[in-house]
Amino acid sequence: MKNTYEYNVTVSKVVDGDTVDVDIDLGFGMVYKKQRVRMLGIDTPESRTRDLVEKKFGKASKKHLKKLLEEAESITLISHDKGKFGRILGELFAHHIEGHPVFGHRVNVNEQMIADHHAVPYTGENKDLVEGQHMANREVLLANGTVVLDD
């Protein structure tokens, strides 16, 4: 098993529903800037694709992730490894201010994206194997009005 490390981070950019750029606080005033993090264990629809339907769901996932992160008072990254494209593979945890419904609890943002139907569990297998789960999420997001397809 690979070593895991925990850091306080500041999200500088939400790239898409499962990828963010962060500045990592290493302590002692040292910050490792603009590090790309691929959120471990999830897959979201692509927001940069020629498939216009998938793009709508991808943009909705990106927007939802941005909202989850903006609501947090602070964010922690648990890094697990580097992926095949050189990105950090990790889990993001949101910490909330007093008065927020989950104050005092550390929310795993990766898992929250799955619970909110914006992501599916994914461990690197062939993406065709999770396509059915993506389709089920689409139905939920259409039914609850999160995503509206134009005629």
Predicted regions located by residue number:
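Small beta-barrel nucleic-acid-binding modules, primarily SNase/OB-fold domains
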Residues: 1-151
